[in-house]
Curated annotation (Swiss-Prot):
Domain of life according to the entry: Viruses
A GO CC term attached to the entry: host cell nucleus
Keyword Metal-binding recorded: no
Protein name: Penton protein
Key word Transcription present: no
Length: 489
């Protein structure tokens, strides 16, 4: 017997044996031999099945659509035909359909274009009104006063940040003319002033006075000056964003700033320069250092004595935010605990837009597909509202303000030029203006329904799900493609 066992079988014997099953070619179902046959077909009602792709155009101002479809709509909520056939009227196109092969899951790359003409002060964006609490009446004999809340409304328009502050102060003055003046309230008791200065520059801690005798007339940040009993309510407005003040916890309800909130923000009185510059009397010692009590027209600064020294009857939000620890020796300002100073935003804090294509896109599982109004349409994409705040540097704001006052007769903004607190605030050297920016956005792939109507509804809503009347151009393109097979579960 051989040491290595039997010899291997001959070649002819091996090849004559049937091939084992584990080395045979696998069996392939018929549909895999033609993987694209009919699975990417797009069917128009008037054409036979075609295998090429198509583009869908959503345009807000097709002339053929306006009369039949959009007489009661606008550029942010409209209907448009997507069957590209000029022989069809919009009514006929509404009976047509585009059928995407239902054996596949379809998606489309969504690209949009939006143009807006949104002004900075408008009722739509809640940037034209706020509530203020002012002195309603004053009894000189008893010294008692009553305070009431009033709504002030600015005229709508596209204004810069400095003009908005001027309009706010003018609205406060008009309220005084309507109510307070008729009931014994003096001009120095108006109680609310919007300003832009830092009233603490030049402060002497020894005398508690502004020793230069004048408040520095330079722009720092929008400020709110209040007297006792007065308040400003920003609960239903975005003007606080325009002024650069926000709540530290913005989702909490209510936003009221009162005089009592501005602890440590007392505006220091001015040095009485007229008394200081007088020659000292014989044996009187040095110059007279005392607080200025009233302006040249007799309007009082309401100077009063406190534990911290002499202060005026006015409190500044800007001072309370920045200088409370210096004045009251507190570790942290009470205003800082719930307020935050921000860069002014002339847009009022413009938010986002939502896209809805209720007749085309598959609704997300969290939305009910039964919505019949723009406020209830399923949201398929979002983008920022196309408006931005642009900053323009003005190296000579004071010169520009003087020229403007003398050429444009803007004395109405400076009704009390003799009063150091009530005078017109300085204009900013960094002027903000709103700019509507055309945006082209790629939203990625959007899942599509398999049957598309020849007329499609398009809705672009704001953060409150309202249609936006300031959208004046809205267009979109969709390029359908297959995402996957519907048989793959």
């Amino acid at each position: 017997m051989s040491r290595y066992g039997n010899a291997p079988p001959p070649y002819e014997e091996v090849v004559s044996v049937a091939t084992p099953s584990y080395v045979q070619q696998p069996w392939v179902p018929p549909r895999y031999f033609a993987p694209t046959e009919g699975r990417n077909s797009i069917v128009y009602d008037q054409f036979p099945t075609c295998y090429d792709t198509t583009k869908l155009f959503l345009v807000d101002n097709k002339s053929a659509d306006i009369t039949d479809l959009n007489m009661q709509n606008d550029h942010s909520h409209f209907a448009t035909t997507v069957v590209q056939n000029s022989e069809f009227t919009p009514r006929e196109a509404s009976t047509q359909h585009i059928t995407l092969d239902n054996r596949s899951r379809w998606g489309a790359k969504l690209k949009t274009l939006i143009q807006t003409n949104l002004p900075s002060v408008t009722d739509y964006m809640y940037t034209n009104s706020l509530r203020v609490k002012l002195m309603e009446s004053y009894d000189e004999a008893t010294g008692t006063a009553t305070y009431e809340w009033h709504d002030i409304t600015l005229p709508e328009g596209n204004f810069d940040s400095g003009r908005i502050i001027d309009l706010l102060n003018n609205a406060i003055w008009e309220l005084y003319l309507t109510y307070g003046r008729q009931n014994g309230v003096r001009e120095d008791q108006i109680g609310i002033k919007f300003d832009t200065r830092n009233f603490r520059l030049g402060f002497d801690p020894l005398t508690n006075l502004i020793m230069p005798g004048h408040y520095t007339y330079e722009y720092f940040h929008p400020d709110i000056v209040l007297m006792k009993g007065c308040a400003v309510d920003f609960s239903k407005t975005r003007l606080n964003n325009v002024l650069g003040w926000r709540k530290r916890y913005p989702y909490q309800p209510g936003f009221v700033i009162t005089y009592d909130d501005l602890v440590g923000g007392d505006i220091p009185p001015l040095l009485d320069l007229a008394a200081y510059l007088k020659k000292p009397r014989e044996g009187a010692g040095g110059p007279i250092i005392r607080a200025l009590q009233k302006d040249s027209k007799g309007r009082s600064y309401h100077v009063q004595y406190t534990d911290l020294g002499e202060v005026t009857g006015y409190r500044s939000l800007y001072l309370a935010y920045n200088y409370t620890s210096d004045v009251t020796h507190l570790r942290k300002s009470t205003v800082r605990s719930w307020l935050v100073l921000t860069a002014p935003d002339i847009t009022g804090g413009a938010q986002q837009l939502y896209w809805s294509l209720p007749d085309m896109a598959l609704a997300p599982t969290t939305f009910r597909p039964s919505g019949q109004t723009p406020a209830t349409f399923p949201v398929v994409s979002t983008e920022p509202l196309p408006i931005a705040a642009r900053t323009i540097f003005n190296a000579q704001p004071g010169y520009a303000q003087i020229v403007n006052q003398n050429t444009s007769q803007t004395m109405v903004y400076n009704r009390f030029p003799e009063n150091a607190i009530l005078m017109r605030p300085p204009q900013p050297f960094m002027v903000q203006v709103p700019e509507n920016v055309t945006t082209v956005t790629d939203h990625g792939t959007l899942p599509l329904q398999n049957t598309l109507s020849g007329v499609q509804r398009v809705a672009v809503t704001d953060s409150r799900r309202r249609t936006c009347p300031y959208v004046y151009k809205c267009a979109a393109t969709l390029e359908p493609h297959i995402m996957s097979s519907r048989t793959l579960q």
